Amino acid sequence: TWHSVFTTWVFALCVRFGRLFGSDNLGCCLYMALQTGLLCYAVARSLSLMRRLGSSRRWQLAGMAFFCLTPIWGAYCIMLGKDTLFTATVLLWLVQTVEWARGLRRWGPGRWALYALTALLICLWRNNGLYLALPCLLVFALALARRGDRLRMGGVAAGVLAVMLAFDNLLVPALGIVDNRASGVYSLPFQ
């Protein structure tokens, strides 16, 4: 799919910051640093999760080797696009979900808000992110045994859906952003 409006805004913000110092390249470098930082953080959190789940040292080293020695991850960080931020956010969301499901962290209101923000970023980084986040959130909500957790997860799903509907149907059109090309209309259904 094409770049989402939100991803384009973040990239433009980085480039405009670089222009304050007379360099578009500085802005591109800032965007790459953002991608690299978020991906490194997500990978570190996933490796930490492996340790907390009791994975052997060998599996932890294999996980680290996969991310350190596979060339695609380094290339991902220097590629100016939407996929690196999306991938890092999905990985971070997966780590948060496992931590929640296994009871590895205490989940207060702040943690639920962070979980909702991560799910929302999945939807904002890519146009088709909603098709990943919303069904997962609904399945999680239905699978929960405790009523309080079910309501919280349902609230996260409803909140993400409401923000995305407002973003796509109110904010974006109000700003005059329109994609009337066939690629924009048909890219999501044909994926």
Language-model features, listed with the residues they occupy:
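Short acidic/glycine- and proline-prone juxtamembrane loop motifs at membrane-interface regions
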Residues: 78-85, 125
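Transmembrane-helix motifs of polytopic, lipid-linked glycan transferases
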Residues: 33-54, 88, 92, 96
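Short helix- or helix-capping micro-motifs
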Residues: 60-71, 95, 119, 123
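Specific aromatic-rich, kink-prone transmembrane helix
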Residues: 86-104, 115-119, 136-137
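Juxtamembrane membrane-water interface segments immediately following transmembrane helices
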Residues: 1, 131, 153-191
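Extracytoplasmic catalytic/substrate-binding loops of multi-pass membrane glycan-assembly enzymes
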Residues: 1-14, 22, 26
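Membrane-interface alpha helices of multi-pass inner-membrane proteins
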Residues: 111-126, 138, 159-164
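Short hydrophobic alpha-helices at membrane interfaces in multi-pass membrane enzymes
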Residues: 57-61, 103-120, 150-155
